[in-house]
Amino acid sequence: MNRSFLFAPGNVPRRVEKALTLAADAVILDLEDSVAPSDKPGARKSIAEALRGPRKARGYVRVNAPSTPFCFRDLLETLHARVDGVVVPKIESAADLH
C-alpha cells in the first residue's frame, strides 16, 4: 500500500534521481503539466534511465493525457524501464482510455 507519493518533474534529471532515493512509498515522475513540449523527449529519457537504476521507492510515470499527441510516445519510451505503474491524467470515464 502506498501511503505517500512524491511528485518530481521529469525534465530535471537531478530531481528525478534524488526523488527515487527518498523515503516516499512511491515517486510519480511527471511528463505532463510540469514539462514543456520541447522538454518532453529529454524528460522521457531521464525518467527511463533513472527507473533502471537503484531506488528505494516505487516508480510511477505520469504520462500526458490520451487526447494529446504526447501520450503514446510517453508510454513507448518509458514502459521498457522498471515502471511500477502509470498515472493517466484528465480521465473522465473509462471510454477516455479506449
Describe each PLM feature range.
Residues 1-98:
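Expand to "…catalyze enediolate/carbanion chemistry for C-C bond making/breaking, isomerization
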